[in-house]
Amino acid sequence: MSVIMALDVTAGNPKGLEQFASQNKDTMQAVLEAAKRHGLIAHRFYASDDGSRVMVLDEWPDRQSFESFFREQESQIRPIFEAGGVTSEPQPRFWDELQTDDKFGWGA
């Protein structure tokens, strides 16, 4: 069963992250392709409504797949976070799906 990886960081400039992404499409695509090689299932960036935080929300086959990807790509990922004004060290959290018989969406 896959896991959700949530990376929630303090960010002073989420729009800066968007700007970096639009100006560095090759870098963003290279990181995405590396993630896919490691098994990435789904990926999104989100900003909090007050603009103070950025969250990366991914689905991976397992925790080890993400950790292997992140070790390999950390030097490419760091400038993306820096562009967003990230001021805290990324601390990923991993979430396992609970069996609750009320699944909806995401291909349930």
Identify the residue ranges that each predicted region occupies.
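Short S/T/G/P-rich N-terminal loop/turn motif that feeds into the first structured element of a domain
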Residues: M1-S75, A83-A108
